[in-house]
């Protein structure tokens, strides 16, 4: 059973049935309507039935974990994820929670350090016994925690677009994998810009290196085009003048940039200072969302293209309500990027899956995940595939001076996720 996201929807058939079935409880009928529904749900789903493996579930609460970097070089990217997850939890609680239980969260800081992520994941699963974790950003952090989630049988909702080549019973990947972003984006830029030469850049860790490996294979083997250069920089790097000079000399049709976190601020400022006009030099990024532009400054990246599945400027009712709620909770000046939106999907998809499973038990939630759909997604609509990735649209945006993106392209239909594309292993 899946549920649409309607705030305060007390009149759904499911809830009407509950209300009718518990109308005889005269004491409960004195409660406010939302509390009445919550109590009725909790009684229909007793703790002993919905939590059989010792998770942090009581008759009135269920505890989840939030695990992101709020310090270090990745804080610029991950803070939005934390804010989105807290907003989703607040909205879910306002609707009565999950199976009649309010969501409580325990937040840990991965501190932009992969061993710290693994240590905190173990704490959340073993000590706190959380029913799920919303967390990680970089692939390095996800790779660090994955053995922990598999060993202790936890459930991670991972929000970042990533390189693919992974699938786990213990992870729901709410961002895009390579075929939905890297390959689709390269096809668009080649076709639209008649591009023949590319220069690949990235931060020096697993996601950019693997993504550029996939990009190079696609450029050379499928599109039959040329890569003029490929360079990597340690996380937190601020010196890009040398590679900028090389690119100015080699004149690639497309700069393909997968630099992450705070390094983006230095890179785009130095690019502009070197006289590179992104309205004339095509640059495509798959790592700069509105969150990063907030630090970069719109004037330093205007004209660049980004291939994502979500932009804050998307014009649909779900997104307007989401942006409004986000600004109300976190301030009008906050911006919302692709990963922030994908992080917002995590608590909602978990809630819907728990309700479909009728249980918080990890194995039952994992088994119930395929086919769960969230019609209230700000990006429009998403559905969980059998491979635990999401069906979603691919979009291309162009950076504006105000730090937002203009939507310039989107796929007509949802793209099926394929984390293991043939020929790209």
PLM regions: where:
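Hydrophobic alpha-helical segments within soluble ligand-binding/sensing domains
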Residues: 49-50, 117, 174-198, 209-210, ...
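C-terminal segment of N-terminal export signals and the immediately downstream linker at the start
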Residues: 11, 33-65
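Extracellular/periplasmic bilobed ligand-binding domains
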Residues: 212-307
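N-terminal secretory signal peptides
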Residues: 1-17, 21-41
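Beta-alpha junction/loop-to-helix N-cap segments that form part of ligand/metal-binding clefts
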Residues: 50, 76-83, 95-165, 233-240, ...
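An alpha-beta-alpha
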Residues: 70, 171-235, 254, 331, ...
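Solvent-exposed, acidic/polar segments of extracytosolic/periplasmic ligand-binding ectodomains
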Residues: 45-48, 373-425
């Amino acid at each position: 059973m899946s549920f649409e996201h309607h705030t305060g929807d007390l009149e759904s058939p499911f809830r009407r049935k509950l209300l009718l079935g518990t109308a005889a409880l005269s004491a409960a009928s004195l409660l406010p309507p939302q509390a009445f529904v919550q109590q009725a749900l909790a009684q229909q789903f007793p703790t002993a039935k919905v939590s059989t493996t010792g998770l942090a579930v009581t008759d009135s609460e269920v505890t989840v974990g939030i695990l992101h970097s709020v310090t270090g070089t990745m804080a610029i990217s991950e803070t939005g994820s934390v804010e989105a997850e807290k907003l989703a939890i607040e909205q879910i609680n306002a609707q009565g929670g999950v199976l009649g239980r309010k969501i409580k969260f325990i937040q840990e800081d991965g501190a932009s350090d992969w061993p710290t992520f693994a240590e905190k994941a173990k704490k959340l699963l073993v000590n706190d016994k959380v029913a799920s974790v919303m967390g990680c950003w970089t692939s390095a952090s996800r790779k660090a925690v994955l053995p922990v989630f598999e060993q202790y049988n936890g459930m991670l909702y991972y929000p970042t677009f990533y390189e693919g080549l992974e699938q786990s019973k213990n992870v729901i990947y709410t961002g895009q994998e390579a075929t939905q972003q890297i390959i689709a984006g390269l096809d668009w830029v080649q076709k639209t810009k008649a591009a023949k030469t590319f220069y690949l850049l990235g931060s020096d860790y697993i996601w950019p290196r693997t993504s550029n490996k996939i990009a190079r294979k696609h450029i050379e083997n499928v599109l039959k085009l040329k890569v003029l250069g490929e360079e990597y920089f340690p996380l937190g790097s601020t010196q890009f003048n040398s590679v900028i000079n090389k690119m100015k000399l080699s004149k690639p049709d497309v700069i393909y940039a997968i630099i992450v976190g705070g390094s983006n601020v230095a890179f785009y400022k130095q690019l502009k200072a070197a006289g590179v006009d992104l309205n004339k030099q095509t640059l495509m990024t798959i790592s700069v969302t509105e969150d990063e532009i907030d630090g970069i400054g719109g004037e330093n990246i205007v004209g660049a293209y980004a291939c994502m599945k979500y932009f804050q400027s998307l014009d649909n009712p779900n997104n307007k309500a989401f942006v409004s709620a986000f600004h109300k909770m976190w301030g009008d000046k906050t911006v919302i990027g692709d990963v922030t939106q994908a992080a917002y999907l995590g608590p909602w998809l978990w809630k819907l899956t728990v309700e479909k499973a009728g249980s918080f038990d990890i194995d039952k939630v994992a088994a119930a995940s395929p086919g769960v759909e969230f019609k209230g997604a700000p990006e429009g609509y998403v559905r969980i595939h059998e491979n635990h990735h999401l069906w979603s649209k691919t979009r291309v945006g162009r950076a504006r001076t105000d730090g937002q993106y203009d939507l310039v392209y989107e796929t007509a239909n949802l793209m099926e996720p394929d984390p293991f594309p043939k020929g790209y292993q």
